[in-house]
Amino acid sequence: MKILYYIYQICIALPILLVLTILTAIVTIIGSLLGGAHFWGYYPGKIWSQLICLFLLIPVKIHGREKLHGKTSYIFGPNHQGSFDIFLIYGFIGRNFKWMMKKSLRKLPFVGKACESAGHIFVDRSGPKKVLETIRQAKDSLKDGVSLVVFPEGARTFTGHMGYFKKGAFQLADDLQLAVVPVTIDGSFEILPRTGKWIHRHRMILTIHDPIPPKGKGMENIKATMAEAYAAVESALPEKYKGMIKNEDQDR
């Protein structure tokens, strides 16, 4: 069965998805320029992500979406198991949001320009002024019910285990007094681990935990929220992936 699936993904699924990716990028760029990034920066990417899971025959299960309220803006903090985290969140979290992503992703053909047009936020750590500009852009995006998705680990896992959480997302939530929503991704590591070359068919599960409202302001609130979010995300992982293992490139 694995051999048949590999043949299917190479000969049928991947060519279709390549065309879909280019078309989605073009639609996002043109739509964002003409009609605003609020709609065009989210819905084409959402449909694209759902189609990727559909064509690759990947089942998806969602828990906890009912915990999100109305047009409230949140900062989502998921673990980062692999590349398919993007499709799971974009396609199935059910909230209009902006990504906070590495600056290097801007260089990706079509996709980088589409992300820029959609208003997603590229993190530039080249100097204090660039960091402040990134924070300002993030603050500006969090309006009209739009949320922000940040991977607190900052890098995909090599092992399936979570690394430590960096404080950036939690500091932003503290500054804006927004709730942090811990999100657990399970199954993405089995589909395409960081060092993997082939896509493996496996179910993905997205678990949305209770929002963590601010309990004050300052470093004490930041540390408490980080600890609570980490425990929540880890709680929905399989036993084999529980326990922190630092990623070798997390400090970059």
What function would you assign to each model-found segment?
Residues T24-I47, L54-L56, H63, H69-P128:
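Catalytic core of membrane glycerolipid acyltransferases/transacylases, capturing the structured
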